[in-house]
Amino acid sequence: MTAEFDEEVVFENSPLFQYLQDLGHTDFEICPLSKEEERLAENGQGKQDVHTTEKKSIISRTVEFLKSWSPFLSKKKKDEKIHLLEIGFRLESLRTILQQEVLIQEDVELIELLDPGILSAGQTQNQQNDHLPTLWSIATPNIWETSILFVFLSAVAAFQSWSISSSLIWGPSLILFAAFTVLKTLHTWRSARLRIILRKYCTQVEGTVSNSRAFTNLVRKALRLIQETEVISRGFTLVSAACPYGKAGQHASQHLLGLRKAVYRTVRTNFRISRLATLYMLKHYPLNSEIDNVTNYICVVPLKDLGLGLCEEHVSEEDAHNLTDAFSLPALKVLFQLWIGQSSEFFRRLALLLSPENASQGPSTSPEQLPHFIWSDVVQDLPHTQAACMAELKRSYEFYRYFETQHQSGLERTAKRKEVGELNNLHGAVRSLQLHLKALLNEVIVLEDELDKLSSCKEMQAVTPEASLMLEEKLRIIQPHVQASNTCWEEALCQVERMVRKPTTKKDTGKYSCENLNYPVVSNVPPAMRIEDRDPVPEEQILEAYVEEAVTDQEFNSEEIYLFSPEERERQKREREESRRVLQELKAVLGLKASEAERQKWKQLLFSEHAVITPLLPEEPVGHFEPLLSIYPEEPHKNLGFYGEIPSEINGTEHVKDAPIQVDHGNMNHEDEAKICPVSEEVEPASCKEEEDETPCPAPRTVLPPAIKERLARIHQSSDLNFTSGLATQVAARSLTFTFLQEQTFGDEWDDDDDNEDHDHDKERNNDSSQLEG
């Protein structure tokens, strides 16, 4: 074959042939090998190899047997015991790393690709307690040593008389035997001491791995506590009892500030020391180029590219505050992800370094090659630093978790025992009201679903007895919740009245009753069971935003509200903007609890197609109720209960105030009106919301008697009375949360009307329908 022809020839089954086949190239000439010659050559070589291997195996076994009996090769046996200890330490370390699950899935897959023996080596002796040889196996003498001892003792026992001539023979023998015994004892002691040292280092490896995992879990718990505190205090303070309401006014970054700082300091310190240990392994204990590829390591990335103050050895608190956006939750989460990746990378490189394949092929007593020296040289101060960081973070976490958020000092508890007791009773009543309303809402949804099924059944002309019994049973289930809700409402109002008026005598407390026009008191109703804050309530973990970010600011433009000063209105505006921002963060942090399809389904279950909330028009007076009769002229009874509901969003929750139907302002005194209108520093009365060029509010709402003004001033000055805000939130979150959702139009409900209606009635009806659609 010429040289020019050789360039175009590709041998079959060669690497070039396989490569070209993978690329899809077939326009080349294939030169197949002679298969018969290959087969003959392989068979001949195989037979020769088999005979040679058999001969070598027989000879090697004989030599090994003789060596085992030879007393001059005991040094090699000693080195083999040290080698067994070395392999045992490596296997024990690998088992600890794999069992503690400190490696992320990507690093496990990379180890399986680079060195599959590590995964199998860590699982070879899972049923055994230890990979290291026992002290008994180390101190056990071999056959030659046992034979020498047996022969010597037999000769001593058989010797009958001692003389000077015999002492010349047995004296040197005794000296040699004593020297042999001392050397054997020293060697056994050295091996046992090495085994104890390796056991200590195995315990250190196990402690370091477990501390790393515990620190990761503790940081995860701390971040969850920070997240829950921020979420609950801003968006769910009035719906859940997990966070005190007094912290709702703080900025998001001010919640658990000490815990945020502790998380940043400890995670940053552990990240830096783990990164230095990984770089030290790469520099002083290099492996092959495939394992030490720079693309497989985070530690080779410059720290200045990572940010968050990691490039500096010591960073001040002010610089850390600026670099992490006031120790914000997103920055802490990024730092936590960096720590997880760096920690897993350190243990991955350590596992590859301690692999049995990287051990010395033959027994070696060089201290630098022993694995426990490698371990101590690599980690240095890492275990102590990691333990100190975990202790600091655990102390801060326990303080904010168990002391700051739940307990009070003994002095405060003694000084404010009465006030705290009253607040706890009030909170228990409101909490019970929330749970009863939630259960009531669920039962009402089920009842409405059953009614829809019965109404949609065209074959059923009349209600069957079975359906009647079913409906009666459903109503019987609903009745206790309604009665309990009324009782909780009345008890909460009475608690507020007691806290405001502070009666001197306790005799009138039991006889005192609160009047409520909206919710009449049910007679002969047993008191409802109150649920304490300490009781486990599964619903507290359901974090779902009951607010709509699309609410405009037109609802809050009223300047005629007499309860708030301009500074307070500005503060409420800032809180509404903060609530919208927190809501956007909640969608990214917590995820959506329900899809849009499920929300539409809930809306259809909660409200029928006629249950449309009709807001007041600006040009209509407050006391005018004629549009109620024109919403559904055919069925006037459906208009009841859908008037005067103007929700407003404050602090991330919806507050709804219901006005009674056809209220006679002429027959209503000021005190009754003050009881109807809730007063709180967190709620703006919606009935006074009108434009500036319209008629002002009625006199009873703008001009108040001195007694009412004094009472409102006391309520306004008290920072502990936020009952109306919380109660309105419970009702809004459980009953009228979907009034801000986009309205679904299933058809024009005015198409089926008769064409013989008069022109005035048609005009009024069209105006009302446009109001509904608007």
Curated annotation (Swiss-Prot):
The gene is vezt. GO terms for molecular function: myosin binding. It holds the Pfam family Vezatin. Belongs to the vezatin family. It is found in: Cell membrane; Cell junction, Adherens junction; Nucleus. InterPro entries: Myosin-bd, Vezatin. Residues 746-774 are annotated as: Disordered. It is a multi-pass membrane protein. This is Vezatin.
